[in-house]
């Protein structure tokens, strides 16, 4: 086995975010307000099941133990269950997660579980059905809520819910969210609105630092938890009176990048060292056959030597990320 992926700043990488499509059926104001427009896909289309199997096998040989399937909306893939099963074949991958808008969750969550899915993140930016519709462009709030209930019924011990924190949209609804998670094992993660190439105006209007919520949680007696090595970037808080937890993802906070442990592969097979980096390294030509695995591992390891110490969001440089559906946020 090759050595653990480590960059020039001694950061170790245990976590792969793998986009399997950039298509999404929602039109969220902060991501795809005008809906999905085909652009990134060439004649080869999105990664096949076999390509997913090969690239995750290569990453696991380099120490990856967690894979998150993202999009776009990953459940739009007709072969999504097969993709989960292909990743599950590899015993070195301990966690297989999905980030979904939740609209197919109630229908399919049991099949995903049986295929090997171990964790679920659902995007919910408001607990008000009308506001949910306004943000997403889809009147599917109750369908998504039913999906979260179905995930618990299917045996998932915890469900993570992602909420993009937006000034004058949902930042004043903390009490509503806290009441929702008090009896439920939901980790509610507030994600700071991030500037993208297509979203600069929205960012200027609605960005709010997660530190505002952090200070309020600490004032109310919430306790900051210790992070595990394959966890995502959230600072997680718990409270003895709540079954749920709160996570804060604050990419503009000082030293956010110091604990980076994740790499990204796009739905067309490009390795992205940072969500807000440039270009990407093409891996797809080395995913065609099993015998290419050593070369694929070598290209991944070499690419990591070029990973920067930090993103440049503070300078307004959003890199190649025009919207968050492109490489899965």
Swiss-Prot record:
Q: In which pathway does it act?
A: Cofactor biosynthesis; molybdopterin biosynthesis
Residues holding GTP: 17, 68, 99, 160, 262-264
Xref: Pfam families: Fer4_12, Mob_synth_C, Radical_SAM
- GO biological process: one example: Mo-molybdopterin cofactor biosynthetic process
Which ranges does the record mark as transmembrane? Answer: none
UniProtKB keywords: 4Fe-4S, GTP-binding, Iron, Iron-sulfur, Lyase, Metal-binding, Molybdenum cofactor biosynthesis, Nucleotide-binding, S-adenosyl-L-methionine
Q: Where does [4Fe-4S] cluster 2 bind?
A: 257, 260, 274
What is the uppermost EC class here? lyase
Q: Which residues bind S-adenosyl-L-methionine?
A: 30, 72, 123, 194
A GO MF term? S-adenosyl-L-methionine binding
According to the lineage, what is the superkingdom? Bacteria
Known cofactor(s): [4Fe-4S] cluster
EC numbers listed for it are 4.1.99.22
Q: InterPro entries from the entry? A: Aldolase_TIM, Elp3/MiaA/NifB-like_rSAM, MoaA, MoaA_NifB_PqqE_Fe-S-bd_CS, MoaA_twitch, MoCo_biosynth_MoaA/MoaC, rSAM
The positions annotated for binding [4Fe-4S] cluster 1 are: 24, 28, 31
Q: What does this protein's record comment on cofactor binding?
A: Binds 2 [4Fe-4S] clusters. Binds 1 [4Fe-4S] cluster coordinated with 3 cysteines and an exchangeable S-adenosyl-L-methionine and 1 [4Fe-4S] cluster coordinated with 3 cysteines and the GTP-derived substrate.
Subunit-level organization: Monomer and homodimer.
State the similarity comment: Belongs to the radical SAM superfamily. MoaA family.
Protein task: Catalyzes the cyclization of GTP to (8S)-3',8-cyclo-7,8-dihydroguanosine 5'-triphosphate.
- Sorted alphabetically, which NCBIfam families does this protein's record hold? moaA
- The name of this protein is GTP 3',8-cyclase
Species this protein is from = Klebsiella pneumoniae subsp. pneumoniae (strain ATCC 700721 / MGH 78578)
The organism that produces this protein has a lineage beginning with: Bacteria, Pseudomonadati, Pseudomonadota, Gammaproteobacteria, Enterobacterales
Q: Gene name, please?
A: moaA
